[in-house]
């Protein structure tokens, strides 16, 4: 996974920024769910395919893609959401996936979910 454009938190709720990360991809490549949840939206927004998944207190968005899921579908981490489409503005190559993460109305960096993973050692059982 290569990041084409990083998250840039807006200084104000409607100010400029980049409310997600852009990940380089291949045309028609599979787009998979990052975590389990329920699809709350799958369809076009401003001419591009979008899928939104609710995960309890947060929701993730994926665009542009040709959705393979419909609203109400329950997905697990790794399930197919659709196929990557061209047409994301600002992408330096043919196709990029814009991946967003929201908690309420606050945009978060979706990559922080991976950066915060702390290794844990488990006790060795002798028996």
Can you say where each PLM-predicted feature lies in the sequence?
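Solvent-exposed coil/turn segments that connect beta secondary-structure elements
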Residues: 8, 28, 44, 56-58, ...
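Conserved beta-strand positions that form and line the central face of beta-propeller blades
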Residues: 22, 52, 61, 83, ...
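Short, well-structured beta-strand-loop connectors
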Residues: 30-39, 69-86
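Short hydrophobic beta/alpha edge segments that flank linear recognition/processing sites
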Residues: 50-53, 75-92, 97-98
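Short glycine/threonine/proline-enriched tight-turn/helix- or strand-capping micro-motif at secondary-structure
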Residues: 2-33
